[in-house]
């Protein structure tokens, strides 16, 4: 544990059963709750066994019976779907700043975290640690620099300080581009370069991506950033850069993603779908090869 962390166990708590309509998402929490196969399983589990692990919550500021969820957003959503009217919870006396840190720390252990979730989680924690550093009643004795906090976050998540900063840069992307990063259509490094484009430039880029069915390589992203910083980037230049054939670009077949997505589990990412398709093609190729050899041996 680092000097920046606030262990949940160190806080006095009380248990309670809280009506679901009195529970609210923590303001700005970065973790997405989606209805997929895993969520369906959680709903069925709650219907059969109830909630095994209580939610962790804090009382909302200036209220007496309203609460913010620190840990358990998925359980809360599943409970609503399961028809529950109240859930077990542990109420901790967190300040807003402590709560922000706890929200991030309690969710970063998940098996799969999207780049957008990491981006806003790291940003939330960095801002909270910065605020915490200004308080003498919390764990930091002096204001921490961005470098200090990024290093601390990196140690907790097994990432370098620079990688933490890269993820935080993604929060400057428009939602449409950030979605492409989550879908693994744009890699992290090119996405960081694109984050330096203005909002309008990003929307112009998105228009070209949609019309030309292409995404920028690192080289293209770097050129777009350079043109933007020079103040000369416009829709025409974006189109010109994106229309250039990439060095390793080869002829390809494309089709709407939605046409095949329905054949795979909801929990599959785009990469999972891609790998499954390759396996199916590979299995079919091996089957045809075996059939050919059998014919040749006759």
Descriptions of predicted regions:
Residues 1-92, 98-112, 288:
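Short, charged/polar connector segments at secondary-structure boundaries
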Residues 49-53, 132, 142, 202, ...:
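Glutamine-centric residue-chemistry signal
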Residues 77-172, 196:
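Amphipathic, charge-rich alpha-helical segments that serve as recognition/docking helices
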Residues 161-276:
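Amphipathic alpha-helical extensions and coiled-coil-like segments
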